[in-house]
């Protein structure tokens, strides 16, 4: 249908629309009109993706000079594929309405691992190996040698793309990863470089967060993108952690040993080249004196090691004299390596700021700050000059150079923690140097500054006001939306006591208490008897899950549960988990019913939707606090308190509740879906925890469901499931939670829609 959203004509590819979708579009349009950033929380399963695409594409067509591109960032490959499918639907609706093909290009971009079609490269399992192999076939000097001698290994797909692919832009249309690969096979072009080349003139680009947030990748892929773009971070409740990970470096003893052998290899190569081709080293020296940035010289295939710091921090001047010649630079790296090794020989934990680390470095081995800043850039130049084909082997040394560049660039927002052993195994010496970023706003700041509108959206962003604080930006709109329901299809409840009135909680003091573990077991047992099909249960950590399940086994509870449903368990091994998931779904299909035991913050809690009968109940055993004894976390909490005045307890509770909401939100994936949300811990009933749940869950959490015993919870569940079992047709939803075009235009409906969004 065609909608009028605040004066903008929007094509919406379905016959009916949810009221909150319309409300969401209104907020989005306000954000785009103001050319500012927005934070929007929309309940899961209410068609967030299609509303975003429909509105922004309509905006692009109405104001082609204002918004030139939509950059849609999602987390996992399946999510990227989902967005592309929605976009395809939207475009075919446009074409059907207008009766002509639109000059519109939308495509997905992923890593070489997901896009490469070269027969020698595709069988490799790990992304790092694929990148290394690709580089060894496409680097400019490899190609130059191939021009001389055609028998040498090369990549014909890249050669073809280089000759023909650049002249012919991608034909208009929507391309997911498989479409790109199919096109590559047909034309004989490399799909990965074709996609990277095409994002510059595409109308919609869908890719992963890292392409914008990780400076090492963003520098290669996204730096040409125009300012007049709208960036959407979908499922962005975890965005601060992505920012922090992209700027942090961990160095272990093993990494440093491998750095040593990397340096030895480079030393030998330099000596060999000195004897055979000294001119090459002289040319490099001259380039470094002139201070040319390597990037402009190197072709796209070579620019493999990008600078780990943000673009505005990279120095544009010549490389310092002390590291210009190859031998001097290798000697410099050796001194740095020896110093870091020496620092790892500690007996107790050390925590210090980057300036303190640098002054120690200057005193011990006379290394100044300035040459350190050029480390990453200088190593990139050296590996290029020495024509090192497989860069994957040099990743330890690259890591060390990245650390050197980061530690000398940033004085604030980072901390260095040296731990002599892992807390869990204090007897085994396993020293690690954590160079940890504590300020999430560092990585995302260039994105906010460069693009005119950035939208952060997810189903679980409560409390909204904490995101602008920790990411340090000023949104023009902040809104959270409720779920309009014709029947209440979610039933959240907090179970705080067992049938024997013992308070149940996963807190440290009562964690080992046999009565608490027994009551948790009883809860699962009784729920498995009344809930049809699938139940997903989340524990706070792998360790806690293992000890609880072992205890249930001894008490004979597991045996009783298995009479009702089959049990599957998520483990830390990805392959095992996917088999468990597959079998879990099979058991739900067969009507045998199944229970999946998994972990908050694990793979299952983030990216997997339990649609309809795959998840009729989600049980959250305990409050999923992060491991609070971690020193990195303590340093970050201190930083948040000093810089942004966020109290430690507030942040920890916020973090736990966003993960809890993320877990229970897996059950509701649409308005026709229904599910129980069981919070099994008495602490959830406290106002500070409950108030941090998303508004659409809070609204249905009645006072009568706050501190139930297991029996009372089971009674509530029975009553709810009996109601949900009544036939439910689309007609029941019309006018309430599903609107046709006529209904949408009535005054009364528009007033109701006004109340859906709650601005902050």
Swiss-Prot record:
[4Fe-4S] cluster binds at residues 116, 134, 155, 190. GO terms for molecular function: 4 iron, 4 sulfur cluster binding; 5'-3' DNA helicase activity; ATP binding; ATP hydrolysis activity; DNA binding; metal ion binding; protein-macromolecule adaptor activity. Residues 7-283 form the Helicase ATP-binding domain. ATP binds at residues 42-49. Component of the 7-subunit TFIIH core complex composed of XPB/ERCC3, XPD/ERCC2, GTF2H1, GTF2H2, GTF2H3, GTF2H4 and GTF2H5, which is active in NER. The core complex associates with the 3-subunit CDK-activating kinase (CAK) module composed of CCNH/cyclin H, CDK7 and MNAT1 to form the 10-subunit holoenzyme (holo-TFIIH) active in transcription. The interaction with GTF2H2 results in the stimulation of the 5'-->3' helicase activity. Component of the MMXD complex, which includes CIAO1, ERCC2, CIAO2B, MMS19 and SLC25A5. Interacts with CIAO1 and CIAO2B; the interaction WITH CIAO2B is direct. ISGylated. Its EC number is 5.6.2.3. One of its GO terms (biological process) is response to hypoxia. CDD domains: DEAHc_XPD, SF2_C_XPD. ATP-dependent 5'-3' DNA helicase, component of the general transcription and DNA repair factor IIH (TFIIH) core complex, which is involved in general and transcription-coupled nucleotide excision repair (NER) of damaged DNA and, when complexed to CDK-activating kinase (CAK), involved in transcription by RNA polymerase II. In NER, TFIIH acts by opening DNA around the lesion to allow the excision of the damaged oligonucleotide and its replacement by a new DNA fragment. The ATP-dependent helicase activity of XPD/ERCC2 is required for DNA opening. Residues 438-637 are annotated as: Mediates interaction with MMS19. Belongs to the helicase family. RAD3/XPD subfamily. InterPro entries: ATP-dep_Helicase_C (IPR006555), DinG/Rad3-like (IPR045028), DNA/RNA_helicase_DEAH_CS (IPR002464), HBB (IPR010643), Helic_SF1/SF2_ATP-bd_DinG/Rad3 (IPR014013), Helicase-like_DEXD_c2 (IPR006554), P-loop_NTPase (IPR027417), RAD3-like_helicase_DEAD (IPR010614). This is General transcription and DNA repair factor IIH helicase subunit XPD. It comes from the Eukaryota. Its cofactor is Mg(2+); [4Fe-4S] cluster. It comes from Mus musculus (Mouse). Coiled coil: none annotated. It catalyses: Couples ATP hydrolysis with the unwinding of duplex DNA at the replication fork by translocating in the 5'-3' direction. This creates two antiparallel DNA single strands (ssDNA). The leading ssDNA polymer is the template for DNA polymerase III holoenzyme which synthesizes a continuous strand; ATP + H2O = ADP + phosphate + H(+). One of its GO terms (cellular component) is transcription factor TFIIH holo complex. PANTHER family: DNA REPAIR DEAD HELICASE RAD3/XP-D SUBFAMILY MEMBER, GENERAL TRANSCRIPTION AND DNA REPAIR FACTOR IIH HELICASE SUBUNIT XPD. A motif (DEAH box) lies at residues 234-237.
């Amino acid at each position: 249908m065609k909608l009028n959203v605040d004066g903008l004509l929007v094509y919406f590819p379905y016959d009916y629309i949810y009221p909150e979708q319309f409300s969401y579009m209104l907020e989005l349009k306000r954000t785009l009109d103001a050319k500012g950033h927005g934070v929007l929380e929309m309940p899961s399963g209410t068609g967030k993706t299609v509303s975003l695409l429909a509105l922004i594409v309509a905006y692009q067509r109405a104001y082609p000079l204002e918004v030139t591109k939509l950059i849609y960032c999602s987390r996992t490959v399946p999510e990227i594929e989902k967005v592309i499918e929605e976009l395809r639907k939207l475009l075919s609706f446009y074409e059907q309405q207008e009766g002509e093909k639109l000059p519109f290009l939308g495509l997905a971009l992923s890593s070489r691992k997901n896009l490469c079609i070269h027969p020698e490269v595709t069988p490799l399992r790990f992304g790092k190996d694929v990148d290394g192999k690709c580089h060894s076939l496409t680097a400019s000097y490899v190609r130059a040698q191939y021009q001389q001698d055609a028998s040498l290994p090369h990549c014909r797909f890249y050669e073809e793309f280089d000759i023909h692919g650049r002249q012919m832009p991608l034909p208009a249309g929507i391309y997911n990863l498989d479409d790109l690969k199919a096109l590559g096979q047909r034309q004989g072009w490399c799909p990965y470089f074709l996609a990277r080349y095409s994002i510059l003139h595409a109308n919609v680009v869908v890719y992963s967060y890292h392409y914008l947030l990780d400076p090492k990748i963003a520098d290669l892929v996204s730096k040409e993108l125009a300012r007049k773009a709208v960036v959407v971070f979908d499922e962005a409740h975890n965005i601060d952690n992505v920012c922090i990970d992209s700027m942090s470096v961990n160095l272990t003893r093993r990494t440093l040993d491998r750095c040593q052998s990397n340096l030895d290899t480079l030393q030998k190569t330099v000596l060999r080249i000195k004897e055979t081709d000294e001119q090459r080293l002289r040319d490099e020296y001259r380039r470094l004196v002139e201070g040319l940035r390597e990037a402009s010289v190197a072709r796209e295939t070579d620019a493999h090691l990008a600078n780990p710091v943000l673009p505005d921090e990279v120095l544009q001047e010549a490389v310092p004299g002390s590291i210009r010649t190859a031998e001097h630079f290798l000697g410099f790296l050796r001194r740095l390596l020896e110093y870091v090794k020496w620092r790892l020989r500690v007996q107790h934990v050390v925590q210090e700021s980057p300036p303190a680390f640098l002054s120690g470095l200057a005193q011990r081995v006379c290394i100044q700050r300035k040459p350190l800043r050029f480390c990453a850039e200088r190593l990139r130049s050296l590996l290029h000059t020495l024509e090192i084909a497989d860069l994957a082997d040099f990743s330890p040394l690259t890591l060390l150079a990245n650390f050197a560049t980061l530690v000398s660039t940033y004085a604030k927002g980072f901390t260095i923690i040296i731990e002599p052993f892992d807390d869990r195994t204090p007897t085994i010496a396993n020293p690690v140097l954590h160079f940890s970023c504590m300020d999430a706003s560092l990585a995302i700041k260039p994105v906010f500054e460069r693009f005119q509108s950035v939208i952060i959206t997810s189903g679980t962003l409560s409390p909204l006001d904490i995101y602008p604080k920790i990411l340090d930006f000023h949104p023009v709109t902040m809104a959270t939306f409720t779920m309009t329901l014709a029947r209440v299809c979610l039933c959240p409840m907090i179970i705080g006591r067992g049938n024997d009135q013992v308070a149940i909680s996963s807190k440290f003091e009562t964690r080992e208490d046999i009565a608490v573990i027994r009551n948790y077991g009883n809860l699962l047992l009784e729920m498995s008897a009344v809930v049809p099909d699938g139940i997903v249960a989340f524990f706070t950590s792998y360790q806690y899950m293992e000890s609880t399940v072992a205890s249930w086994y001894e008490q004979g509870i597991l045996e009783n549960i298995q009479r009702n449903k089959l049990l599957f368990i998520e483990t830390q091994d990805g392959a095992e988990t996917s088999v468990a998931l597959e079998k879990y779904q099979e058991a739900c299909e067969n009507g045998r019913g199944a229970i999946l035991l998994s972990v908050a913050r694990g793979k299952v809690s983030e990216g997997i939707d339990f649609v309809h009968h795959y998840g009729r109940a989600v049980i959250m055993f305990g409050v999923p606090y992060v491991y609070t004894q971690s020193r990195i976390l303590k340093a970050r909490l201190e930083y948040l308190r000093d810089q942004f005045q966020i109290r430690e307890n507030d942040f920890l509770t916020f973090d736990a509740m966003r993960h809890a909401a993320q877990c229970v939100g897996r059950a509701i994936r649409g308005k026709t879906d229904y599910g129980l949300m069981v919070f099994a811990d008495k602490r959830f009933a406290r106002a500070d925890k409950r108030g941090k749940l998303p508004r659409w869950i809070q609204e249905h959490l009645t006072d009568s469901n706050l501190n139930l015993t297991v029996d009372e919870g089971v009674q509530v569940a029975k009553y709810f499931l009996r109601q949900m079992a009544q036939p439910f047709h689309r007609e029941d939803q019309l006018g309430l939670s599903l609107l046709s075009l006529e209904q949408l235009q009535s005054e009364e409906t528009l007033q109701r829609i006004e109340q859906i969004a709650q601005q902050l």
